[in-house]
Amino acid sequence: MDRTLVQEILEVVEQAAIASAQLTGLGQKDEADAAAVEAMRKRMGTIQMQGRIVIGEGERDEAPMLYIGEEVGSGTGPGVDFAVDPCEGTNLCANSQRGSMAVLAASDRGGLFNAPDFYMNKLAAPPAAKGKVDIRKTPTENIKILSDCLGIAISDLTIVVMDRARHKNLVSEIRSTGARIQPISDGDVQAAIACGFEGTGTHCLMGIGAAPEGVISAAAMRALGGHFQGQLVYDPAIAQTSEWADYTKEGNIKRLNEMGITDIDKIYEANELASGENVAFAGSGITDGLLFDGVKFEKDCTRTSSLVISTLDQTARFTNTVHIKDGAQSISLK
């Protein structure tokens, strides 16, 4: 993986974001996702690489494109593994709400954890708290550590938690410390990454979300030097989701074992979820969010706002791109 490829993956997420954004607010979440998938797959196909999807839209028999194990790219060049979410926050996009984006993580072959389609308990925090907060500690303990590391009063800390019934006790404990809570309905990748930047108003992400998105968040936080830990959740009583209505704890453990995951309670650090020598993250806003704006359609151009983070040169680049239409007559400065 090289710097040229990092530029290419920026364009991949830009095209996916533009495709989804055309359906923003129309209540068509499946169509928005499909549009992003098709655009992402098409742009990936032009890149000189031997790409492979390790986290995607599902198993081969569940998804027509960007399925797990699918080969993407020209078929020549470096071997690259991808974890993709072409439209993270499909409900957000469908309802024109904040926080939807096209995202992916890339690494050298074998450098991304093949996360099962399970849930994951996550903890994300700023670089100053890396290795000091710990998912094994209670939320109260971690909030006190955050306050000390950041030099911020607990009452001024904001903790992001997904708005789910399973987080009732977590929310109650956080509130008991005096810290603030920002509930989100979907899209915890952007919230996790926001913890890595000062000035976002987001200081920590706690709670359970999707495991595949945890790998994407881990890749970004590793490149930023931030803190990220994840632990797979296999007990339906903890996940509290209708998606597991017919699943049992024992059945889920069996599924994990069949996938080669025998240490089912392992706590994964960012550099284990994204272990490659070279790791990159790319995200482009579909709707406005914590880190960047969504797609803006104008008469003669389309504007995208994106972020690329890479370990190759230890950079985080915020990029505003003007995609000029054929026959454009006038393009405003901003």
UniProtKB/Swiss-Prot annotation:
Listed pathway(s): Carbohydrate biosynthesis; Calvin cycle
Cofactor(s), names only, from the UniProt record: Mn(2+)
Protein EC: 3.1.3.11, 3.1.3.37
Keywords, ordered alphabetically: Calvin cycle, Carbohydrate metabolism, Hydrolase, Manganese, Metal-binding
InterPro entries: FBPase_class-2/SBPase
Database matches in Pfam families: FBPase_glpX
Disulfide bonds: none
Keyword Transmembrane helix part of the UniProt annotation: no
Metal-binding listed as a keyword: yes
Gene Ontology annotations of biological process type: fructose 1,6-bisphosphate metabolic process; gluconeogenesis; glycerol metabolic process; reductive pentose-phosphate cycle
Residues reported to bind substrate: E88, G89, T90, Y119, R164, A165, R166, D186, G187, D188
Family the UniProt entry places it in: Belongs to the FBPase class 2 family.
UniProt protein name: D-fructose 1,6-bisphosphatase class 2/sedoheptulose 1,7-bisphosphatase
